[in-house]
């Protein structure tokens, strides 16, 4: 019996993200070397709920600390093995994300990347109004769809994104096992004061 290697799903998604950030001008400010990509397991694959999320590792305007009710707080830091600090974490919720059709997977990936602040400062892109993370959902979705279409028209290599065509069962049949990086959600913690 020959053992098949597992398929590293988070590394594959990170490669798609890198290609999108290279090809789409509106995403070129993103340095994927400073964006961690992980997965979180969902209880089921129902097409309801969250498919992915972007977690900023800084507060508003890229600040490392915030003051709430007279106390200073910071976020837990996350580093690459070479010591470079991550500024964002992209989480993909599996198997829920995997069960989406290709078009929705691409929309979801670009949707999350577009949350990254244009100054790449660890904060989210902010819009005017109460819904600072999206502004108008209709307008946000229109922008995302346009960026996905731009990426597809740029003819990205099939070997980078073809795995997104598969659902969970197809991936298991093709690769035998899925693997990926699990990253604990960072906590807001009291800041050390000198």
Describe every region a protein language model picked out.
Residues 91-108:
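Short pre-active-site segment immediately N-terminal to the catalytic Zn-binding motif
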Residues 105-119:
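Active-site recognition of the HExxH zinc-binding catalytic motif
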């Amino acid at each position: 019996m020959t053992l098949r290697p597992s398929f590293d799903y988070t590394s594959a998604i990170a490669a798609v993200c890198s290609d999108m950030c290279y090809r789409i001008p509106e995403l070129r400010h993103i340095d994927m070397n400073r964006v961690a990509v992980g997965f979180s397991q969902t209880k089921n694959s129902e097409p309801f709920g969250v498919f992915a999320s972007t977690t900023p590792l800084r507060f508003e305007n890229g600040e490392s600390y915030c003051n709430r009710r007279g106390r200073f707080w910071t976020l837990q830091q996350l580093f690459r093995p070479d010591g470079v600090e991550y500024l964002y974490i992209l989480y993909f919720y599996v198997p829920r994300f995997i069960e989406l059709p290709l078009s929705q997977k691409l929309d979801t990936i670009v949707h999350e990347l577009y949350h990254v602040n244009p100054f790449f400062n660890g904060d989210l892109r902010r819009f005017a109004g109460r819904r600072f993370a999206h502004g108008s959902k209709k307008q946000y979705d229109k922008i995302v769809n346009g960026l996905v279409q731009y990426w597809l028209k740029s003819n990205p290599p099939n070997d980078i994104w073809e795995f997104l065509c598969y659902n969970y069962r197809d991936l298991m049949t093709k690769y035998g096992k899925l693997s990926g990086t699990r990253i604990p959600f960072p906590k807001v913690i009291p800041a050390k004061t000198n």
